[in-house]
Amino acid sequence: MKYFVVALALVAAFACIAESKPAESEHELAEVEEENELADLEDAVWLEHLADLSDLEEARGFFGNTWKKIKGKADKIMLKKAVKIMVKKEGISKEEAQAKVDAMSKKQIRLYVLKHYGKKALQKASEKL
């Protein structure tokens, strides 16, 4: 259960990284330079700093691809867990549970699984008290 919570925290962190705004490209910086006709030294330093952001775009692309892979695997695991939970909880066949889960959206599947494990963790905590 601890590993599951840690994995969800990592997925949330990667989601934040993937959702962040992309840095300005070098082409856009050239347009800004032409529009403003920058001659001031401070402006040149500012543009130089923004040019370094292209490296950040490459890093963001790497983390974005990694995030997509992790999210895809997490979705598959959640789908399998949802089927197992339904079979166990509702006492229906695996095929019927699979059909129900297939009809659900990814968000509904995540909520269903997290709700189940949340109740389970709460029960364990109350038993210890």
Swiss-Prot record:
Q: Name one GO molecular function term.
A: toxin activity
Q: In which tissues is it expressed?
A: Expressed by the venom gland.
What is this protein's name? M-zodatoxin-Lt8g
Listed under GO cellular component are:
extracellular region
Q: Which gene encodes it?
A: cit 1-8
Gene Ontology biological process terms in this record? cytolysis by host of symbiont cells; defense response to Gram-negative bacterium; defense response to Gram-positive bacterium
Q: Which organism is it from?
A: Lachesana tarabaevi (Spider)
Name the domain of life this protein comes from.
Eukaryota
Motif Processing quadruplet motif, residue numbers: 57-60
Q: What lineage, starting at the top, does this entry show?
A: Eukaryota, Metazoa, Ecdysozoa, Arthropoda, Chelicerata
The UniProt entry, under InterPro entries, shows:
Latarcin_precursor
